[in-house]
From Swiss-Prot:
This is Beta-galactosidase. InterPro entries: Betagal_dom2 (IPR018954), Betagal_dom2_sf (IPR037110), BetaGal_dom3 (IPR025972), BetaGal_dom3_sf (IPR036833), BetaGal_jelly_roll_dom (IPR025300), Galactose-bd-like_sf (IPR008979), Gly_Hdrlase_35_cat (IPR031330), Glyco_hydro_35_CS (IPR019801). Transmembrane segments: none annotated. Its EC number is 3.2.1.23. One of its GO terms (molecular function) is beta-galactosidase activity. GO terms for biological process: carbohydrate metabolic process. Gene3D superfamilies: Beta-galactosidase, domain 2, Beta-galactosidase, domain 3, Galactose-binding domain-like, Glycosidases.
Length: 1006
């Protein structure tokens, strides 16, 4: 926003005095920074008042969804998600950056290949999506260590505090990632409009300064020093007011908070507990940050699912379309202006990046599934709300009132919250007073309008609010100069075209609705039956009532066409911005929104653009689909769908119609059980001939871990030796006295971890894991040992990831992995000399392409056999379906031809493991570099996505697996197969294979 010179002089004068600047433009209070350099940049690009953000001087509501690039590291597929978000009517995506993936070794920042953020930013720009950058350094995110690299366990200072050792440890990462973000912020023509320093900085232990203004200011200064000039926003984990503007040092520019009102009990997806619907957020906002727009930086879009949980299908049921209607519209009642849903797309926890309490899938029950499908009804419901927000600018300038059970509705069973506008229209959010009610309630409304106070319906009958539903009724809604005095049906969108205006309204099945329009024109039904439609003309308006039908009706009132739809029909409509200069829709601006067209096209419409006399649509189809286009510019004569010229007809209302045929491809998937499987023992460490001379010695007398002191003669904490991820192996050498009868050990691997112990080649036993246990103390009986003879104890520990660091001062991220105690407890027992290993090289990890977390310490991993084309020619022939006959770990490999048609079909293939004979396994698909943990006694997910972008997708695929048998009887997979969902004819285009180097003999591998 540009200021007059007089205003600028006043600002500079106040700035010189160190004051915060406030001024009024067009009746709104704007807040400017006291820092002149920052203010100079922001005044043109991103500013705000107490109502909303302004981008380039234009008021805008930020409607956003969370999506993490590291959970879908394929550029073209990132564009796919951005386009699906754009199609919702959203204009923004929020993203985390996982520090652990880009600085696996202190001082070495590597953000290339799949970890390069710039293609992610470019894809956002191509889709016309703004970005909210959230690089941490702490992110939580159900990620290992909350995004902290494992080497922070050695930092001599409290994490997320002003301790110098911790701050110094963050400098390299933040300076690099913030500089990249600065390069792509809006001031440089990029998509990034907001920056969040820290994450959920909300709770601290007693004895620790919290909140620490010095710490928070340091994190903010790190970003500013790297060139970040866009506004800083925070996300208090609850509406507590921490670091809000005006709180002093460490205050952010815009205060935001999180909210997950239904919690995470997916096991009871139909239960909405009493009292969980927020009702005081507006009051808290006015108390905590009245000068900034109301922001919820994380509002519940799904749920995580723990080991043994009911699965993400249940989570998507708990947080379904009904939840969205009730809870998201409730947020609108608070005049939310920055709303980000966590998650919009969850993705996958590739290669050990997840935290201990979760598994491979991070589907999150979100609107877009892990396999990138948009078949959940909650996606379509979001589209209705997102598009309504785009065409309701008066919402942002209205004045929210208090909720009430009297004054608007004629029954106390309903609660109404008004947002009253002057000349910009008003909004009335209606819900059940018992928000979880599944009853249908009949009601009438009395609403203030420009035509006076009106009792609705005027033409007789009643309105209906069905169970677990909510509505936003509008009054004096401006449809490009036509005043909608009121509408009880909800607004999907409206547009002004050269030949008139179009308004799209929808209602639920079985409902009756009514609207009134300021006009002297008559009502004409121009499509569909007149049955169930009534109207009445007054001196200055016309009132229309109708019963919702599954068949579309169109009525004409003057130059306004009104489409009357049921909700399920409205799901099939899309409102793409119409590009006239190139193919990209561009960012959402009032001009771009106004230029949109309306398309009925089923599964997905990605983009629309004009080129010469052609109207080009890019769209996805999962069935033969009738396509209709409303508002085609007069310059367009031909229709192209996905690049193909498509014949079309034009009806009397100017609607273009065409049909896209869908022919399901003939897909023949190979039978995995019939492949020529090769096997290699991946636990050679228990063989008598095994040489561990190259292993690091666990000989540190002290630990650098400040959370837990040593209870062993030397440190057996893996992070002290640079091993932070995946399987850990220990070999303890001792010379027997002959008195030893038992071996006691306490292993730590995180929630649901497992461990196994051998003496030489003799299996002693295993801990198969429980969700509630992150460590386990076991005592194993020993056979009679021969005095003077050397023995080796081999311990395998499944490291499930590092703990998150939610509460400042607890330093739970430093919870060690490995062995906390071990001994031969008998009186004259010999001491044990330990060696250990994790991934080859530890922090000097071997595979720079796949990153520092991808590999663990199993023999096959250290050798690189999990990579494509391992040297399996001379391996034993054996299948994971045959498995192991005794406790151990095997690695299985097979190749096959995957011949998929290259006709634009997206197949969303998956690997499905349906059952296990024995309790635990791990498997790895080398083509996707996914590590999955499947535990029989707390198994939740048994399907793994195979996204496009995998190398050699249409030629040789390689599947590798490490079944871990924690039972003396061995173990095997009961079933292993490839499957696919309904193929989608997609306009996404070619997906380039990400770099996946093949096997190469590793120097120094042991």
């Amino acid at each position: 926003m540009k200021l007059s010179s007089a205003c600028a002089i006043a600002l500079l004068a106040a700035q010189a005095a160190g004051a915060s600047i406030k001024h009024r433009i067009n009746g709104f209070t704007l807040t400017e920074h006291s820092d002149p350099a920052k203010r100079e940049l922001l005044q043109k690009y991103v500013t705000w008042d107490d109502k909303s953000l302004f981008i380039n001087g234009e008021r805008i509501m930020i409607f956003s969804g969370e999506f993490h690039p590291f959970r879908l590291p394929v550029k073209e597929l990132q564009l796919d998600i951005f386009q699906k978000v754009k199609a919702l009517g959203f204009n923004c995506v929020s993203f985390y950056v996982d520090w652990a993936l880009v600085e696996g070794k202190p001082g070495e920042y590597r953000a290339d290949g799949i970890f390069d953020l710039e293609p992610f930013f470019d894809a956002a720009s191509e889709a016309g999506i703004y970005l909210l950058a959230r690089p941490g350094p702490y992110i939580n995110a159900e990620s290992s260590g909350g995004g902290f690299p494992g080497w922070l366990q050695r930092v001599n200072g409290t994490l997320r505090s002003s301790d110098k050792a911790y701050l110094d440890a963050t400098d390299n990462y933040v300076s690099h990632v913030a500089a990249t973000i600065a390069k792509y912020q809006i001031t440089n023509g990029g998509p990034i409009i907001l920056y969040q320093p820290e994450n959920e900085y909300t709770s601290g232990c007693s004895g620790v300064e919290f909140p620490d203004p010095v710490y928070m200011q340091y994190v903010e200064d790190q970003a500013r020093n790297a060139g970040v000039v866009i506004p800083l926003i925070n996300n208090d984990a609850s509406a507590s007011g921490n670091n809000a503007p005006g709180t002093g040092k460490g205050a952010v520019d815009i205060y935001g908070h999180d909210s997950y009102p239904l919690g995470f009990d997916c096991a009871n997806p139909t239960v909405w507990p009493s009292g969980d619907l927020p009702t005081n957020f507006r009051t808290l906002h006015l108390e905590q940050s009245p000068t900034t727009p109301y922001a919820i930086v994380e509002f519940q879009g799904g749920s995580y699912d723990p080991w043994g949980g009911p699965g993400f299908a249940a989570c998507s049921e708990l947080l379904n379309n009904e939840f969205e209607r009730v809870f998201y519209k409730n947020d609108f009642s608070f005049q939310i202006a920055i709303m980000n849903l966590y998650m919009i797309f969850g993705g996958t926890n590739w290669g050990n990046l997840g935290y201990p309490n979760g598994y491979t899938s991070y589907d999150y029950g979100s609107a877009v599934t892990e396999s990138r499908n948009i078949t959940r009804e909650k996606y379509s419901e979001l589209k209705l709300l997102g598009n309504f927000a785009k065409v309701s600018p008066g919402y942002l300038t209205a004045s929210p009132g208090n909720l009430t059970t009297s004054g608007y509705a004629d029954t106390t069973d309903l609660t109404v919250t008004p947002l009253l506008g002057n000349s910009t229209g008003s909004f009335f959010v209606v819900r059940h007073s018992d928000y979880s009610s599944e009853e249908s309630t009949s009601y009438k409304l009395r609403l203030p309008t420009s035509a006076g106070s009106v009792t609705i319906p005027q033409l007789g009958g009643t309105l209906t609010l069905n169970g677990r539903d909510s509505k936003i009724h509008v009054t004096d809604h401006n449809v490009s100069g036509t005043n909608i005095i009121y509408s009880t049906a909800e607004v999907f969108t409206w547009k002004k075209f050269a030949d008139g205006k179009v308004l799209v309204l929808y209602g639920g099945a079985g409902e009756h609705h009514e609207l009134a329009i300021s006009t002297k024109s008559n009502v004409t039904v121009i499509e569909g039956s007149e049955s169930g439609i009534s109207s009445k003309q007054t001196s200055s308006s016309v009132v229309v009532g109708w019963d919702v039908s599954t068949t579309r009706r169109i009525i004409q009132v003057g130059d306004l066409k009104i489409l009357l739809l049921d909700r399920n029909s409205a799901y099939n409509y899309w409102v793409p911005q119409l590009a006239t200069d190139g193919t990209s829709p561009g960012f959402s601006t009032p001009e771009k929104v106004a230029s949109s067209i309306i398309v009925k096209a089923g599964y997905l419409v990605r983009t629309a653009y004009l080129k010469g006399s052609g109207l080009y649509l890019t769209a996805d189809f999962n069935a033969t689909t009738s396509v209709e286009v409303i508002g085609v510019p007069s310059t367009a004569k031909n229709l192209f769908i996905n690049g193909d010229k498509t014949s079309h007809t034009v009806d009397k209302n100017g609607i273009w119609s065409a049909t896209v045929d869908y022919n399901a491809p003939d897909i023949s998937l190979p039978s995995l059980k019939d492949l020529d499987w090769k096997y290699v023992d991946t636990l050679p460490e228990i063989q008598s001939s095994y040489d561990d001379s190259l292993w690091p010695a666990a000989d540190l007398k002290q630990t650098k871990n400040t959370l837990r002191s040593l209870t062993t003669p030397t440190s057996l904490y893996s992070s002290d030796y640079g091993f932070h991820t995946g399987y850990l192996l220990y070999r303890g050498h001792f010379t027997a006295t002959g008195n030893e009868s038992t071996f006691a050990i306490d292993t730590q691997g995180g929630s649901a971890f497992g461990s196994s112990v051998w003496l030489n080649g003799t299996y002693l036993g295993s801990w198969t894991g429980l969700y509630a246990n992150s460590d386990y103390n076991a005592t194993y009986n020993l056979p009679q040992l021969q005095a003077g003879k050397t023995y080796v104890i081999t311990v395998v520990i499944d490291n499930m990831g590092l703990e998150e660091n939610w509460t400042v001062g607890e330093d739970l991220m430093k919870s060690p992995r490995g062995i906390s105690t071990s001994c031969l407890p008998d009186g004259q027992a010999a001491p044990i000399s330990w060696k250990l290993t994790g991934n080859l090289g530890g922090e000097d990890y071997e595979d720079k392409v796949r990153g520092p977390l991808n590999e663990g310490g199993l023999y096959a991993e250290r050798q690189g056999f999990h990579q494509p084309e391992p040297p399996s020619q001379n391996w034993k022939s054996s299948s994971p379906l045959e498995g192991l006959s005794e406790a151990g770990i095997g690695f299985y490999s097979a190749s096959f031809d995957l011949d998929l048609p290259k006709d634009g079909m997206s197949h969303c293939s998956s690997t499905s493991v349906t059952a296990l004979r024995h309790p635990r396994t791990a498997c790895r698909s080398t083509s996707t570099d996914i590590v999955c943990e499947i535990h029989k006694q707390h198994r939740t997910s048994d399907q793994l996505p195979c996204p496009r972008g995998n190398p050699e997708l249409s030629r040789n695929e390689l599947v590798g697996g490490d079944p871990v048998a924690l039972d003396s009887a061995g173990g095997k997979l009961e079933s292993l197969e490839l499957s696919y969902t309904t193929p989608v004819l997609t306009a996404l285009g070619e997906v380039e294979s990400v770099d996946q180097p093949k096997y190469k003999k590793r120097k120094g591998a042991y």
